[in-house]
Amino acid sequence: MDVNNVELIISAVRPEQYPETDLPEYALAGRSNVGKSSFINTMIRRKSMARISQKPGKTQTLNFYKIEEALFFVDVPGYGFAKVSKTEREKWGVMIETYITSREQLRGVIQIVDLRHKPTEDDRMMYEFLKYYDIPVIVIATKADKIPRSKWQKNAKIVRETLDFDPDDKFVLFSSETKMGKDEAWQFIKEGME
């Protein structure tokens, strides 16, 4: 997709704050500091539309990015961040669950994992949660440029096995540095919008 127009419409915490729209939405889920903001910025060809932080746990709201009057990316708080209070994590959990289980415009979730590492228990639980609610998932295995090409398939296999990956879902090797996987990710997103 050729992206020229992107706008952060709202940062929401409750359903009544969600934008009133019929446009399809894709939520972006992933561990804190896994590269969600870098993924968004790569996909929309912007350097800093989604704030990239060295500090995990920066995103604390549902951030609705309208793309080309065609769809929304919804950046959700990263999970698995230990330095946030248990109460705060529980609030985020309720906020994310409410959005994912009740939003009619949601076409799928883009779950971002780090190709360099075996998915965490939090990654596995998120994927299992999405499958329980029968939500289509595009797994983006990011940071592919950080490991030798010869390890890509081995690491991808570990990710798939750890998540108990559903073959009906999509899987993309991705790099924000080289833009590898960008076109493939857009293709899967477009297919889900039809």
From Swiss-Prot:
Residues 22-194 form the EngB-type G domain. Mg(2+) binds at S37, T59. PROSITE patterns: G_ENGB (PS51706). Its cofactor is Mg(2+). One of its GO terms (cellular component) is cytosol. It holds the Pfam family MMR_HSR1. One of its GO terms (biological process) is division septum assembly. Keywords: Cell cycle, Cell division, GTP-binding, Magnesium, Metal-binding, Nucleotide-binding, Septation. The keyword Cell cycle applies. GTP binds at residues 30-37, 57-61, 75-78, 142-145, 174-176. It comes from the Bacteria. CDD domains: YihA_EngB. GO terms for molecular function: GTP binding; metal ion binding. The keyword Endoplasmic reticulum does not apply. Belongs to the TRAFAC class TrmE-Era-EngA-EngB-Septin-like GTPase superfamily. EngB GTPase family. Necessary for normal cell division and for the maintenance of normal septation. This is Probable GTP-binding protein EngB. It comes from Listeria monocytogenes serovar 1/2a (strain ATCC BAA-679 / EGD-e).
